[in-house]
Every structure is written in C-alpha cells, then in structure tokens.
C-alpha cells in the first residue's frame, strides 16, 4: 500500500471518529428555553435567544388537554399531549421577533421569541 493511500485512510478514519464529538459540541451550544402552558397561557409570554444559535424549547403542558405549539414563520408545529413535556428544536435564526401560539387557542395563547 502506498504512503499516500495510507495517509488518506488515516485521515478518513480520524474524520469519522471525530463526528460524534462535533455533534455533541453543536448540541451543547444550543440555547435552551423553558416554557410552560396552562389555562390557554404560556409562561413566560416572551423569551429571548441569541442570534445565529440553535434553540431548544422545553415545553411543559400542564393542562389535561392537548395543545398544538406552532409558528408559521419558523415552520414549527408540534402536538403536545395533556400533562406531558415536549422538546422543540428550532434552527438558528437572524435577529427578529417570532410568534408561537397554540393552534387550538390561537387568539389568546401566544408567546414571543425575541432573537437578538
């Protein structure tokens, strides 16, 4: 086996071996936001996150009924069963204000994500 071929194999092996480490580093750099939902209200009603950073929303539905967490601008939609928790992953965003709502109670159940 030639030296060039051995170096190529070693480089590929090293790159593949480092993939899990890169994934963990990316997961750790996400901003985590805690939200709760009860009586058609989100708490808190407004949250902030840094720009250009992935966001992980940890949502706890304290109501007995299901709700649908949705944002049309961010193309995020998730049904959350009553009395349960959900994790919603949001891609990194540019600065701005993004609205989320419960589709079943859209007019009153709203939360704002402010990205700075």
Please annotate each region the language model reported.
Residues 55, 65-67, 109-111:
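Short beta-strand/loop motifs in extracellular/secreted proteins, especially
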Residues 29-34, 80-116:
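Extracellular/periplasmic metallocenter environments
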Residues 29-52:
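N-terminal edge beta-strand
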Residues 16-25:
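C-terminal segment of classical bacterial N-terminal signal peptides
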Residues 59-61:
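Asparagine-centered strand-capping/turn motif at beta-strand->loop junctions
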């Amino acid at each position: 086996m030639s030296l060039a071929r051995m170096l190529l194999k070693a480089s590929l092996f090293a790159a593949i071996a480092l993939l899990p480490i890169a994934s963990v580093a990316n997961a750790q750099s996400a901003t985590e936001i805690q939200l709760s939902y009860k009586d058609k209200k989100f708490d808190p009603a407004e949250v902030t996150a840094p720009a250009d950073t992935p966001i992980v929303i940890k949502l706890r539905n304290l109501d007995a009924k299901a709700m649908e967490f949705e944002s049309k601008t961010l193309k995020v939609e998730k049904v959350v069963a009553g009395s349960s928790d959900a994790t919603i992953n949001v891609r990194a965003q540019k600065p701005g204000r993004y609205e989320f709502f419960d589709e079943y109670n859209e007019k009153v159940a709203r939360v704002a994500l402010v990205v700075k």
